[in-house]
Each structure stands twice: as structure tokens, then as C-alpha cells.
Amino acid sequence: MNIHEYQAKHILSRFGVSVPKGAIVHSLSEVDDAISKLHSKVIVVKAQIHAGGRGKAGGVVVCRTSDEAKASIKNMLGSTLVTHQTSKDGQKVRKVYLEEGCDIKKEYYISAIVNRKQSQVSIIFSTEGGVDIEEVASTSPEKVIVCNIDPLFGFQSFHGRNLCFDSNLSLDQTRKISDIAEKIYKVMLSTDANQVEINPLVETSSGNFIALDAKINFDDNALYRHPDIQELRDYDEEIKEEIEASKYGLNYIKMDGNIGCMVNGAGLAMATMDIIKYYGAEPANFLDVGGGASQKTVTEAFKIILSDKVDGILVNIFGGIMRCDIIANGIIAAIEEIRINVPLVVRLSGTNFELGKKLLDDSSLNIITANDLSEAAYNIVNIVKK
């Protein structure tokens, strides 16, 4: 689960990380009150969307007067931002964050992420802040320092020193950055976050370190332990089909292709998307119905797929605990309930797959069955291309 920048900064401040003073604005009627809370000649107006790249898209504006700030807020609220992290349709700006300007001497990057390969938390630090860390890692890998924290021992003082060892930083700078690294590590553990990122972490002329921008992503599977964090969820920033899918235990991710996919199992779903691309088409979604799909979930899965503009649907089911004949009956019932006006190719394998295939073939419905995944993908791609 993602949250907005202003929410991430509020969490960081609770753990002792310094952030600029700011105020959130949802409508023009709140602007004067928000500006009055700030005591700075420079006001930064920031669009609050769940995507990076806001600055280049006009979503971050530095204003030197209240009138400039008001004009920027008026232009920004209700507008649509298109960045490299949004879809081509962009995201609507429903709220903006006003922040006091900051005296910037130097920009750094620091983050904590879950390192699944090492089963540890990795702290990443760079003296090159304010840009994508992937770009820095590509052009100047020596400037990106990674320190892995064993959860058995937690963050130790030497971890902070190791982060700054080759960065030509003073003892005071090292101490302050180490302190921030320890704090974001505590944020990770305390909130079950997958990622805590400060970019840029700025050093002011007075030697203070401030989180100028922040991003936190939480583990959805651990949200039940954090009702306070669940309250931060902004459904307006999420894809409505993904929200609807979660109500029925479906794992759905919208994509930009034109062939809808319904699969059981995440690995099989990814393989299905790969083979669709192999035959020259693009998947419209990732959809894992799980191992206990019922007629109801299959029906809802079809509805969610068809809510997007798809030219065809590929159903790929492996019957293990879930028998293929039950799935076939669910598919038939779902099609009879909701009219599917696009080509549908179904591949069944596993327990009772012969019976399931026969049920589909004998149903008199417009269903094309396939014997294996390659045949199924080839068929749906070629039908859609005609």
C-alpha cells in the first residue's frame, strides 16, 4: 500500500526525522488558512499523487509570494499529471501540499528496503540525491552504498559508519546520517513497510539534515496489524478494478495490453503473460484467482476483465486441489450470467481436465479449448489479430 508524501513525512517525524513544516489543501477554500500556518517567504506547492516524477511534470512549484502560491494551487487542483510512473492517462490531483522553502546546501539519497534475496533490510545511501537512484547506480555505481542489516542483531553504529566511509563526509555529517539511517530502519520494522525512501535528504547551510521528499510503501499482508496505517489509504489513487478484485480475494493488476488473462497461481499467471508476449501480443492484466476459486469468484473475475477494453480472454487453469470440472462449470455459469462478446480461449490441465474440457466443448457456448498453454496463447493472439 502506498501513501502520500505528506503522510510519509508525518510518520518520519514521529520517529525523529526532521521534515519541513507543511499544510495539506483539498480545496481552494483552505488555501488562506494553510498559507497562514507557514512562516517562510518561499512556499513550495506539491501535487499529492501516488507517483514519482512530479517535478518534471509540473507537479512541484516553488513560489516566492502568497499570490504565486495561490495561483499555482488553483492551476494544480483538479489537473491531471502525467509522469513516467503514471499511465498515459495520468493521475488527477485531488490535494496539494504546501511546504516551507528550504535552504539547500547538498542533496543526498537514503532508503531502507526489504532485501528478499538476503532476508534482510538493506539501507541504501548516496551522496547523489534528488535524482532516480537507478540512474545513479547505472552511471556512477561507486556512489551507491548498500548496507545489509541482519534482523537478528538490528541496526548497529558500525552500519552507519559503513554507509558514509567512502563518501568524504565529516564526523558530524556521518553521525547525523547514521542517526537518520537508524530511524528509517525503525520505521521499517515498526510499520511493516517494504520501502522507506528519502530523496532528497538535504543538508542545510546550518548543517541540519531534512527529509525534503519521502515515500513509504507498506506490506498489504501486514496491514491488519496497523489499523492506523490502513486509515491512510487513498482509494482515489488506486485502480478501481484492483480495489474491486481485492473484495473477492482476487489478485489483479491492470496493464496496457488487449488480451485479458484469468489464471490460478502467480507463477502460472506470469508464464501466461510471457507467452502472450512471445506470440506478439500484450496482456491486459495479471489476474490470479487463487487455489479455491468458486463460480462466484470466476464470474467476478470475468466482470473485472471485461470492465477494461480487451479484445480477447485467455483462461489458463491448472487443477490441483481445485478440480477442472468444477472450474469448467464455473466458467459456463459465469458466461451464461454475463454475456462475453470477445473471443475466449480456455486451457485446462490437471485433475479431471478431460471432463472439464468435455463440459466446455459440449456447452454450445462460444468457447475455444486448447490442449496446452502454447496452443492456447497462439490461438487467442491470432484470433485477436484478425
Curated annotation (Swiss-Prot):
Binding of ATP, residues: 46, 53-55, 99, 102, 107
Pfam families: ATP-grasp_2, Ligase_CoA
A biological process term (GO) from this entry: tricarboxylic acid cycle
ATP-grasp domain residues: 9-244
One GO location term (cellular component): cytosol
InterPro entries registered for this protein in UniProt: ATP-grasp, ATP-grasp_succ-CoA_synth-type, ATP_grasp_subdomain_1, Succ-CoA_synthase_bsu_CS, SUCC_ACL_C, Succ_CoA_ligase-like_bsu, Succinyl-CoA_synth-like
Reactions this protein catalyses: succinate + ATP + CoA = succinyl-CoA + ADP + phosphate; GTP + succinate + CoA = succinyl-CoA + GDP + phosphate
Superkingdom, taxonomy of origin: Bacteria
Enzyme class: ligase
Annotated keywords: ATP-binding, Ligase, Magnesium, Metal-binding, Nucleotide-binding, Tricarboxylic acid cycle
EC number assigned by the record: 6.2.1.5
Residues annotated to bind Mg(2+): 199, 213
Pathway(s) the chain acts in: Carbohydrate metabolism; tricarboxylic acid cycle; succinate from succinyl-CoA (ligase route): step 1/1
Gene Ontology MF, one: magnesium ion binding
PANTHER family named in the record: SUCCINATE--COA LIGASE [GDP-FORMING] SUBUNIT BETA, MITOCHONDRIAL, SUCCINYL-COA SYNTHETASE BETA CHAIN
Function of the protein: Succinyl-CoA synthetase functions in the citric acid cycle (TCA), coupling the hydrolysis of succinyl-CoA to the synthesis of either ATP or GTP and thus represents the only step of substrate-level phosphorylation in the TCA. The beta subunit provides nucleotide specificity of the enzyme and binds the substrate succinate, while the binding sites for coenzyme A and phosphate are found in the alpha subunit.
Assembly and interaction partners: Heterotetramer of two alpha and two beta subunits.
The family this protein is said to belong to: Belongs to the succinate/malate CoA ligase beta subunit family.
Protein name: Succinate--CoA ligase [ADP-forming] subunit beta
Organism, as annotated: Ehrlichia canis (strain Jake)
